C-alpha cells in the first residue's frame, strides 16, 4: 500500500465540488500546482446563514464547465496532457458531489483518461504535500466545518482515525456561535478576528472526555456560549462580544492543541500536519506553532490560507498518490456523502 513508483511528470486534473466551492486544478507530480481555480458561492449562501444544498448544486452546474476551461487555460495544457482525473467522491453534499463526479466521468470517458476517486479529507491532508514532502509516520489534525479528527498515517494512502468529534465539528461550533453573536456566515473568520480584540475572561467548559481519549466534543461548549448570551440578556448585563469570542476560541484551541500534542508523542510521529478550513484560523496556527516549537523531533506543517479552504489542488495531490498506487475508478463511480476515510 505504501510503496509507489513515481513516473516522470505525472499530470493530474483535480475536481472538487463537495460543498460550496466549484474548483478545478492541475498538479504536477503531486507536489507542484500548475493551475488552481476556485469559484466560491459564499455570497449566495450568506443571507441564509449557511450552505443551502439546492443552491450549491445549481451553482456547481453553472460553474463547472467554466472553471474547468479556465484551469486548462491557466495550466496551458490540453486533455491529452493529463494522466488522470481525480475527483472528490465524498463525503459532502450528495447533490454537490454529483456535479463534480459526473463532470469527471464525462471528461474521462470522452478523452479516455483514467479516473480516480478521492476522499475529501484525504485531500485536505495532502494539501500539505503541496507545501513540503511528507514523512511517515505522521499525524494530521483535521479541523473543518464538517470534520474534526486526528488521523494517523504510517504510509501513503493509509489513514487511521485515532480521534474524532462525537457531536459538532469545530467549524460547526464556530458558525453557530457566530450566529449567536449576530455575525454573518461563514462565522469562523469573524470569531477569529474578534477573539484577537478580546480577552478570554469568561469561564467556558473544555470537553476532555476520558483521560486516554483523542476524541472531541464541542456541543457542550456551543450550548454554554448560547446560554451565557441568553442569561446576560435576561439579566440586562452587557457581555463584550470580543471577550466571549476570545473565551470560546481559547476553549476550542486548548482542546485541539493539547490532544494533537499528546497524540504526536504517543504515536512517535515525525510530522504533524494541519488540515481543513479551520486551519486558516490565526489563533489555532499560532498556538500549534508555540506548542510544537518545543518538540525537537516533530516537524509542524501548516498550509497557506489558500490551501486550507476547499480547493481542487489538494484533491489532485491526494489523487496523485492513489493513481501511482494503481487505484482506478470505473465509470460507475458515484457520489458517496458518507464515505469512510479508513475504508
From Swiss-Prot:
CDD domains: ASKHA_NBD_TsaD_bac (cd24133). One of its GO terms (molecular function) is iron ion binding. Substrate binds at residues 142-146, 175, 188, 192, 281. It catalyses: L-threonylcarbamoyladenylate + adenosine(37) in tRNA = N(6)-L-threonylcarbamoyladenosine(37) in tRNA + AMP + H(+). Keywords: Acyltransferase, Cytoplasm, Iron, Metal-binding, Transferase, tRNA processing. It is an enzyme of class 2 (transferase). The keyword Repressor does not apply. Its EC number is 2.3.1.234. Pfam families: TsaD. Fe cation binds at residues 120, 124, 310. InterPro entries: ATPase_NBD, Gcp-like_dom, KAE1/TsaD, Peptidase_M22_CS, TsaD. Binds 1 Fe(2+) ion per subunit. Required for the formation of a threonylcarbamoyl group on adenosine at position 37 (t(6)A37) in tRNAs that read codons beginning with adenine. Is involved in the transfer of the threonylcarbamoyl moiety of threonylcarbamoyl-AMP (TC-AMP) to the N6 group of A37, together with TsaE and TsaB. TsaD likely plays a direct catalytic role in this reaction. Belongs to the KAE1 / TsaD family. This is tRNA N6-adenosine threonylcarbamoyltransferase.
